[in-house]
A protein has these predicted regions:
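Catalytic binding pocket for nucleotide-activated donors in carbohydrate/polymer assembly enzymes
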Residues: 317-361
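Donor nucleotide-activated moiety binding/catalytic core segment of transferases
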Residues: 276-323
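Active-site and donor-binding regions of nucleotide-sugar-utilizing enzymes
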Residues: 7-138, 142, 316-319
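A nucleotide-sugar donor-handling region in carbohydrate enzymes
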Residues: 114-117, 121-190, 195, 199, ...
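Short, charged/polar "capping" segments at the starts of alpha-helices
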Residues: 39-47, 98-99, 121-122, 248-250, ...
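Active-site regions of enzymes building and remodeling cell-envelope glycoconjugates
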Residues: 49-61, 108-111, 129-132, 267, ...
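Short, hydrophobic beta-strand segments that form beta-sheet elements in well-ordered domains
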Residues: 8, 89-91, 111-113, 265-272, ...
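Conserved catalytic-core segment of nucleotide-activated headgroup transferases in glycan assembly
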Residues: 238-275
Length: 361
């Protein structure tokens, strides 16, 4: 097997960044396959494909059609440029039918998985179980997909994760650190470097006086007094809201975001790539970078600035909570969508990391 290359399959910019790190850790050559749905194809996806492909032997960027029948007819294109056999296949979105198609059509000696996002942390999510949809099961048989989600989980000999210490889709887990090294040497401004969890803090509106938005008037602060004497105190604060289209209706998502902007007096908005609506009341941040990389660049450019990041259940916020001069706040609205077991699990992880959770009415 020594002469065989490895294959790594990505579906998102974050997965491409993880792929870059995984390839850099190994001497063996890699082929890279990045799959992108047509409606998600944008500069951000293309940028991270270029970043990851620089470390590969061969790279393919394949657009997945929106039309169901075009997708079916185009399945063989997913194999274009790939070898018939690989030493190790690496995949994150093992529930995705396109990823499953490729993994069922090639041969590999070993399989390793890595994080799809926070879905890995939710037992019972689509990354843990086979689809129960009868049409999907029929299509899998027609496509020759024998290995599905549960079978791929069992095959995975290890799982590479951004969230060590948390249960995941396969064991053992191996920590994958994307940003700690990049954050070293950043001006700290009253805090240490990339920090560990500083304890659980959950704010509930019934515990203290609330303002007209139904939330706590006083937000929690990290304890920086002990370090202020040795590090310069930031003179400016930027508040950023991370967009997330979590509600089924675009208008409801926009209204929720605008309410959060107003309630927390947030001046900037970083949209999610899947957003199809426009939010008013804040300056849009337009960047080819994912939020984690954008924030690192901002920390370098603005050594006198402190950043407050507000979000609902964002993977990006989980990834930046330990950045210097950065405070992350998780907001939990009263809507039922934010109290399902899966979402509750993500809020639980955030609390374990020491991210303050603010309940609003």
């Amino acid at each position: 097997m020594a002469d065989l290359a490895n294959l790594i399959i990505c579906l998102t910019p974050l997965q491409a960044l993880m792929a870059q790190r995984l390839m850099a850790q190994r001497e063996q050559p890699f082929d890279l396959l990045m799959l992108c749905y047509e409606d998600a194809d944008n500069a951000k996806f293309r940028h991270y494909f270029q970043v990851a492909s620089a470390g590969s032997r061969h790279a393919e960027y394949v657009l997945i059609p929106q039309s169901k029948w075009r997708r079916e007819l185009g399945l063989p294109r997913l194999l274009r440029g790939l070898d018939k056999e690989y030493a190790t296949a690496f995949a994150a979105s093992i529930d995705n039918p396109n990823v499953q198609y490729v993994l069922n059509r090639i041969r590999f000696a070993a399989l390793e998985t890595f994080d799809d996002g926070t879905g890995n942390l939710i037992p019972g999510s689509v990354l843990y179980r086979n689809s129960s949809n009868r049409q999907r099961q029929l299509m899998n048989r027609l496509r020759g997909i024998r290995l599905q989600t549960e079978g791929l989980r069992r095959l995975s000999r290890r799982h590479h994760t951004l969230y060590p210490g948390q249960p995941n889709i396969a064991a053992p887990t191996v920590p994958l650190d994307l940003w700690a090294a990049a954050g070293q040497g950043l001006p700290e401004g009253g805090q240490g470097g990339l920090r560990q969890s500083e304890g659980r803090e959950v704010l509930r509106s019934e515990n203290v006086a609330v303002n007209e938005c139904g939330l706590n008037e006083r937000l929690p602060e990290k304890n920086m007094a002990s370090m202020a004497a040795t590090n310069p105190v930031p003179t400016r604060t930027r508040r950023i809201l991370l967009g997330q289209p979590l509600l089924p209706n675009a208008a409801d998502n926009a209204a929720l975001a605008e309410n959060l902007l107003r309630c927390f007096k947030i001046g900037e908005y970083f949209p999610h790539p899947r957003e199809t609506y426009r939010v008013s009341g804040a300056e849009y941040i337009t960047s080819p970078l994912i939020f984690e990389d954008h924030l690192l660049e901002s920390l370098r450019r603005e050594p006198d600035t402190r950043f407050e990041v507000y979000h609902l259940v964002s993977t990006a916020a989980l990834n930046v909570y330990a950045f210097p001069r950065t405070t992350v706040y998780a907001v939990r609205p009263a809507e039922a969508a934010f109290h399902t077991p899966g979402v509750a699990r993500i809020y639980e992880v955030m609390a374990q990391l020491g991210i303050p959770i603010i309940d609003i009415e």
